[in-house]
Each structure stands twice: as structure tokens, then as C-alpha cells.
């Protein structure tokens, strides 16, 4: 572990303690004229880095892959994955882990360059990334962080001075991604597919030490690992659903063992409440639609359980039973987390038998009247019932009376209930049309002011500030249906 005291780099490379089949050591491919277009000051400071130093030419070179900080050990990680249900051997096709930053508080975070050039896993790709998708990941990941949804984060975006060629010629860019780790369900699938139980154990032991040290001495630690990952994913997916977030590409290589959201390619936030909402242009069957996300998470976790079967128990039948028993607990844990979150969104402290019905009635009405998901809860929080089809309907007025009498029966005051709602119903989300406006200004006009203003508003989604109101409006009909593309 080497520390550069001026900038604060303090890199370790624990991933290289795994068998070499899990990665390939390879340097990033240099670019012609890197330019820093976005730096995350607050994240840099939390990592123990000095923002002013990071703006210097030598540090910008690091973000571009033209140089490496002391202690860096660049490598591309190998993994597999079910992509829309089809199994493939994969790997970092355009990203490199340059090291693990140890923060002043002793936490460990992967520092990864995304768009850093081809690797042995590129599968004929150029290993590069376009500016628009990299800025998009920056905006959405930082919005998720502000919403208190576990996520990878974005430290910096640099332009490369070189074009990337997709459907058209686009400006190239590299994103510096920060994650608790990049270990995925697909990493375990990769280990299992190769057939080495020793390699599988090495990966499981490393993962436990890194993410779940509290279970290291557990009698059945590999079962405990599966339990912990299920618990974190149940919590994560509940938070997605509560915020109206649609990931769009829940392949097993995009499900982290740490429980963080990763890969912001075709993701988007729901406008009108609709269980069938799909934004991704490639998800033609709606596999990863909003309402399917909990089921797909369970499916992905079942693939993790399958991968762990050789080390769950020496008897295969017993191992299979353990795997099935643990996976069956996901839906119970998810439902519990989602229900608790929904109660908070409606200001319900106590438990009453009809609470489930109260929540379901509201959601059914929202779907029937195509009500905006975020703004409906925002209006309820402000007790500002606007002139919309939902709020004007007789069934909503009846529901509203039931809800108000439910609030009246609580020991806590209505003021406390509305305060809890305010802390759980964001006033602002990264609306798809607003994100596109920011990207258009930055990529086409080299104007980052629109993005900066949007990021500032998104940084405090529960503020209910008048400054944010312009970002609360849903898109005009001309901006629908919104389609996303897997540009990251």
C-alpha cells in the first residue's frame, strides 16, 4: 500500500490475492488530449483525496489512463452473467480497476476507470465510452446517493479528445467509478463455471473478509454469505421500487454482492405509475419492467445460490435444499422492507390490519388515472391536493378520508406524520427529460451549467425548496414515451 501525500492516493490491491483466473493485468490505453469536465469534490474529500490536486495535469492524466498513481495495479476483472436470461462468459470489456483506495477512516473502495480502452474481455469492442452516457451515469448515480439508495458513485469525468464511433461519431470520455467492490453475482457464476471448488472458496472467503467480516467465524459461513447478500438485495430492490427507479438491465453481472446499484446504462425513473413501465430499447419483452424487478432480483439471486452449491454442503442434495430455503426468504424480506417504506411514505407510524389495503388502493388508483408517482406522494406530503384526474376522482376522495382518519388514530401528531413523509418522499428525482436537457447542453454545446444546476437540485431531494420546483414538473406529452439505450 503506497500513499501519495499531496493528492492523498492510498492504494491497495487486495483483489490480486485471488487466483489469477479472476483477472488480467493490463495497463489503460492512453488518450490524446484529456480534459477534466467534472470532479466530485465531496466524494474526493471523503476518499481522502485533495480536490485541488486532482485538477492538476498529472492527476487528470490518471483519470484518463495516461498515468497511474503510486501503488496502482491496473487489472480487468473476469466474470460471467445471464444477459436477458442467456449465460455468457464476460469480463471488464472497457474498464480497469486501478486499485483500492483506503480512506482516512479505513474504508476500502475500488477505483475503476470506465472507457479506458480494450481488454482481453472486450469481445471485439473498442473499449471506449461516449461522453453522454458517462455524464448520465454521473448524474443518476449521484442522485441515487442523495436519495439514500446504495450505489456506486462517480468521482470524475474526463473527455479524451478522441471520437468514439457508435451509430454516429461521438466525443469520447472516461468515468472514474467508485464502488465498495465490483464483485458481482456473475463473478461467482464465473468461478462455478470454471469448475474449481478451490477458486470458488477463495472468492467466497475474499468476499466475506471484504464485505461481511462479521460472519468469518460463522459455522456455515457460505450459507451465511448467501443470507447476507439476499438481505442486502431485498433492501436495495425495495428502495428502487419506493423511489420509482427502473434499472433496465438486471443481468446477473449487474447484481453486486455488496448490495450497491451498479451500471446506469438504460435506467430511468418512472413518471406515471405503471407496473409495466419499461424504458430500455433492448428490453422488448419487458423482462426488467418496474413491476418485475423484485422477481428478477430473486431469479438473479437463485443463480448465485446455484453457484455456491458446491461449497454450501458436502452432500449435493442437502446443499440444494439450503440454497432453495434461503432463496425462498427473499420475497418475504423484500415485502417487509417495501411495506415499511410505503408506510413511511404515507406517514404511518403504527400498525393496523387495513394498512396493506390502504396502500394497495392508492396504487391501483394511481395506475388507473396515470398519476405521476413522485408528484402524487409529494402532493400528499404537502397536503396540497391539486386538480388532477386522480385527486378529482370520487374513489380518491373516499380514500383520502380513510387515510386522514388513519392518521388521526395514531399517537403521533399529524405534524410528525407529515415530517416523516417529507423525509421519505423526494420532492425531486432526475426526470428523464431534464437529464436529457443537461446532456444535450454539455455534449452538443459544451455547456455544463445546465448539468451543474440539475446536480445541485438533485443533491438534496428531500429539501422541498422553492428553488427545486422547476424540476418537479413531469415531461410534456411530446417527451413520451421515453427510451433509454445501453450507452454505459
From Swiss-Prot:
The keyword RNA-binding does not apply. Keywords: ATP-binding, Magnesium, Manganese, Metal-binding, Nucleotide-binding, Nucleotidyltransferase, Transferase. ATP binds at residues 91, 93-94, 114, 126-127, 177, 184, 263. It comes from the Bacteria. It catalyses: L-seryl-[protein] + ATP = 3-O-(5'-adenylyl)-L-seryl-[protein] + diphosphate; L-threonyl-[protein] + ATP = 3-O-(5'-adenylyl)-L-threonyl-[protein] + diphosphate; L-tyrosyl-[protein] + ATP = O-(5'-adenylyl)-L-tyrosyl-[protein] + diphosphate; L-histidyl-[protein] + UTP = N(tele)-(5'-uridylyl)-L-histidyl-[protein] + diphosphate. Nucleotidyltransferase involved in the post-translational modification of proteins. It can catalyze the addition of adenosine monophosphate (AMP) or uridine monophosphate (UMP) to a protein, resulting in modifications known as AMPylation and UMPylation. Belongs to the SELO family. One of its GO terms (molecular function) is AMPylase activity. Its EC number is 2.7.7.-, 2.7.7.108. The lineage of its organism: Bacteria, Bacillati, Bacillota, Bacilli, Bacillales. InterPro entries: SelO. This is Protein nucleotidyltransferase YdiU. Mg(2+) binds at residues 254, 263. The active site is at 253 (proton acceptor). The keyword Magnesium applies. Pfam families: SelO. Its cofactor is Mg(2+); Mn(2+). NCBIfam families: PRK00029.1. The gene is ydiU.
Amino acid at each position: 500500500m503506497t500513499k501519495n501525500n499531496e493528492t492523498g492516493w492510498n492504494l491497495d490491491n487486495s483483489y490480486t490475492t485471488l487466483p489469477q483466473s479472476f483477472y488480467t493485468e493490463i495497463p489503460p490505453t492512453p488518450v490524446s488530449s484529456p480534459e477534466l469536465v467534472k470532479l466530485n469534490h465531496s466524494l474526493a474529500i471523503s476518499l481522502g483525496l485533495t480536490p485541488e490536486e486532482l485538477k492538476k495535469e498529472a492527476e487528470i492524466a490518471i483519470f484518463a489512463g495516461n498515468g497511474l498513481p503510486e501503488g496502482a495495479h491496473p487489472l480487468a476483472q473476469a466474470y460471467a452473467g445471464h444477459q436477458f436470461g442467456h449465460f455468457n462468459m464476460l469480463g471488464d470489456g472497457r474498464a480497469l480497476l486501478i486499485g483500492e483506495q483506503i480512506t482516512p477512516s479505513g474504508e476500502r473502495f475500488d477505483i475503476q476507470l470506465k472507457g479506458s480502452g480494450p481488454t482481453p474481455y472486450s469481445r471485439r469492442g473498442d473499449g471506449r465510452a461516449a461522453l453522454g452516457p458517462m455524464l448520465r451515469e454521473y448524474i443518476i448515480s449521484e442522485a441515487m446517493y442523495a436519495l439514500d439508495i446504495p450505489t456506486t458513485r462517480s468521482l470524475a469525468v474526463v473527455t479524451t479528445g478522441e471520437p468514439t464511433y457508435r451509430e454516429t461519431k461521438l466525443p469520447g470520455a472516461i468515468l472514474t467509478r467508485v464502488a465498495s467492490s465490483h464483485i458481482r453475482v456473475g463473478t461467482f457464476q464465473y468461478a462455478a463455471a470454471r469448475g474449481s471448488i478451490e477458486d470458488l472458496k477463495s472468492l467466497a472467503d475474499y468476499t466475506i473478509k471484504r464485505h461481511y467480516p462479521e460472519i468469518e467465524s460463522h459455522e456455515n459461513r457460505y450459507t451465511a454469505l448467501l443470507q447476507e447478500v439476499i438481505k442486502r438485495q431485498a433492501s436495495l430492490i425495495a428502495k428502487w421500487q419506493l423511489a420509482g427507479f427502473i434499472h433496465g438491465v438486471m443481468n446477473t453481472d449487474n447484481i453486486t454482492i455488496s448490495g450497491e446499484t451498479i451500471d446506469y446504462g438504460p435506467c430511468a425513473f418512472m413518471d406515471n405509475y405503471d407496473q409495466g413501465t419499461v424504458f430500455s430499447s433492448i428490453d422488448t419483452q419487458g423482462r426488467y419492467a418496474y413491476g418485475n424487478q423484485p422477481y428478477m432480483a430473486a431469479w438473479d439471486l437463485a443463480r448465485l445460490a446455484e453457484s455456491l452449491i458446491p461449497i454450501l454442503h458436502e452432500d449435493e442434495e442437502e446443499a440444494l435444499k439450503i440454497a432453495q430455503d434461503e432463496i425462498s426468504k427473499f420475497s418475504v424480506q423484500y415485502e417487509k422492507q417495501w411495506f415499511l417504506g410505503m408506510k413511511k411514505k404515507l406517514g404511518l407510524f403504527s400498525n393496523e390490519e387495513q394498512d396493506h389495503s390502504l396502500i394497495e388502493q392508492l396504487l391501483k388508483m394511481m395506475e388507473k388515472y396515470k398519476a405521476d408517482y413522485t408528484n402524487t406522494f409529494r402532493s400528499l406530503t404537502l397536503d396540497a391536493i391539486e386538480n388532477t384526474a386522480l385527486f378529482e376522482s370520487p374513489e380518491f376522495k373516499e380514500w383520502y378520508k380513510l387515510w386522514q382518519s388513519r392518521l388521526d388514530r395514531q399517537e403521533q401528531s399529524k405534524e410528525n406524520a407529515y415530517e416523516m413523509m417529507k423525509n421519505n418522499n423526494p420532492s425531486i428525482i432526475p426526470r428523464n427529460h431534464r437529464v436529457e436537457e443537461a446532456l444535450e447542453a454539455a455534449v452538443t454545446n459544451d455547456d455544463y451549467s445546465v448539468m451543474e444546476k440539475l446536480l445541485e437540485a438533485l443533491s438534496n431531494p428531500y429539501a422541498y425548496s422553492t428553488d427545486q420546483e422547476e424540476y418537479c414538473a413531469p415531461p410534456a406529452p411530446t417527451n413520451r414515451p421515453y427510451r433509454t439505450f445501453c450507452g454505459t
